[in-house]
Amino acid sequence: MKLCVALDLASRDENLAIARALKGLDIWLKVGLRSYLRDGANFLNELKKIDDFKIFVDLKIYDIPNTMADAAEVISNIGADMINLHASSGLRAMSEVMNRLANLREKPLVLAVSALTSFSDDEFYEVYNQNIDEAVLKMSQNAKNAGLDGMVCSVFESLAIKKECGTDFITLTPGIRPFKGNSDDQKRVANIVMAKQNLSDFIVVGRPIYKSFNPRETVEKILQEIL
């Protein structure tokens, strides 16, 4: 299991300060929509100059198939090590993205986003007219058939996805709260023990790290727990 630290702070300088504080640790960094729009593609280069971090660019690409493929190609060529697409875009769109990326010299890992962890069961049903478990398995099958590397999902769907798509099909699980505390705007949250039990390959942690008194110490503690 790998730790992916979410860089979701209010400014570029704050995000870079956290990255510098975590230099030398075996982690990935996640650059989300706010940071990418504000700080641009060069922000990835700045992060890699600090410590050659592996970077997950979390933009949840969702558009018509050709536009998705264009966007995925651009992001892949600026140094992303992992990107994601909305599984709701469907099999054809995801397949087109993977066909476009097939000839890249350095292709990133490509994951599909299933049900956002901010959704409650009722909220998901209101939007998709399906329960989460059934919908996520169907999305996962489509992602696997399209040639993607795995899924972004909650811990609660990870094991079922592994059983359906194989243990080598990656699950990246946000909404991880390693210590007791506020779940903030997440509904389907979990801890590290649950992530291990459900065979998560990556866990995403943000606020519990950068809101702590000593972020490096907090990350070191999390890394000990995921061994």
From Swiss-Prot:
Which Pfam families does the protein's record reference? OMPdecase
| Residues the record marks as active site | 60
GO MF annotation list: orotidine-5'-phosphate decarboxylase activity
What chemistry does it catalyse, as a reaction equation?
Answer: orotidine 5'-phosphate + H(+) = UMP + CO2
What domain of life? Bacteria
Involved pathway(s): Pyrimidine metabolism; UMP biosynthesis via de novo pathway; UMP from orotate: step 2/2
Keyword annotations for this protein, in alphabetical order, are:
Decarboxylase, Lyase, Pyrimidine biosynthesis
Checking Gene3D superfamilies in the record gives: Aldolase class I (3.20.20.70)
Supply the HAMAP family for this chain. OMPdecase_type1_B
What family does the database annotate? Belongs to the OMP decarboxylase family. Type 1 subfamily.
Function summary: Catalyzes the decarboxylation of orotidine 5'-monophosphate (OMP) to uridine 5'-monophosphate (UMP).
Protein name per the record: Orotidine 5'-phosphate decarboxylase
Organism, scientific name: Campylobacter hominis (strain ATCC BAA-381 / DSM 21671 / CCUG 45161 / LMG 19568 / NCTC 13146 / CH001A)
